[in-house]
From Swiss-Prot:
GO terms for biological process: negative regulation of apoptotic process; negative regulation of calcineurin-NFAT signaling cascade; negative regulation of transcription by RNA polymerase II. There is a cross-link at K78, K167, K220 (Glycyl lysine isopeptide (Lys-Gly) (interchain with G-Cter in SUMO2)). This is Four and a half LIM domains protein 2. GO terms for molecular function: transcription corepressor activity; transcription factor binding; zinc ion binding. May function as a molecular transmitter linking various signaling pathways to transcriptional regulation. Negatively regulates the transcriptional repressor E4F1 and may function in cell growth. Inhibits the transcriptional activity of FOXO1 and its apoptotic function by enhancing the interaction of FOXO1 with SIRT1 and FOXO1 deacetylation. Negatively regulates the calcineurin/NFAT signaling pathway in cardiomyocytes. It comes from Bos taurus (Bovine). Keywords: Cytoplasm, Isopeptide bond, LIM domain, Metal-binding, Nucleus, Phosphoprotein, Repeat, Transcription, Transcription regulation, Ubl conjugation, Zinc, Zinc-finger.
Amino acid sequence: MTERFDCHHCEDSLFGRKYVLREEQPYCVACFEALFASTCEECGKLIGCDCKDLSYKDRHWHEACFHCSRCRGSLVDKPFAAKEDQLLCTDCYSQEYSSRCQECKKSIMPGTRKMEYKGSSWHETCFICHRCQQPIGTKSFIPKDSENFCVPCYERQYALQCVQCKKPITTGGVTYREQPWHRECFVCTACKKPLSGQRFTSRDEFAYCLGCFCDLYAKKCAGCANPISGLGGTKYISFEERQWHNDCFNCKKCSLSLVGRGFLTERDDILCPDCGKDI
């Protein structure tokens, strides 16, 4: 007895007929198409076994139905773009939706790398430094007067030059005597510690921190021998080419403050009138 070879669904014999295998089960063409064939997005008909099924994102088309929604040109084996469930050839998509390059004014095609800045777009090769004309790409850049500059060109053309190291000042900086300095270059002439944000003074146009200035140039107190800075409202007494801090201007014997009082001198000492009676 001959073994049966029937359609898995309708059980009609498949001897001498076309059939399709699915998951190792045979189906007649009619059953296969009714059960498994995709429906064409364009014409709404089934895509039969004798037709090529073109698919994109779970959507299916007959080969003859796979065309641009705008110009109706075939998209088979061609690049295309999707917009609001419509398929468009690259030309139609560019005319309808693509941004225009700020430099060359041509469309920026789908899939093309582009640069965007403040609502404008450029082809990657059109986004160039205004000075050296080289593509900026993903490097840092600085806008100036509606033009874009790579950092080295901007620094050469616009950045202030530090009076100390002669290099560009790109961020921050300090102005002293109407000249620009890097913060790290503006240092005490003596100890080289940074002066930015610190109190300092100058002598012969050279800047010094208060400590170095006092050590080098300040007069010494005749009482404690420490420097008298004279800065920041420091009060001191001066008498016969000698100086004292206010707190140090005291009677040598009784330590009474002599600020605003009469006093006597005994060699290098100063005395209050009472202690001076015995001289």
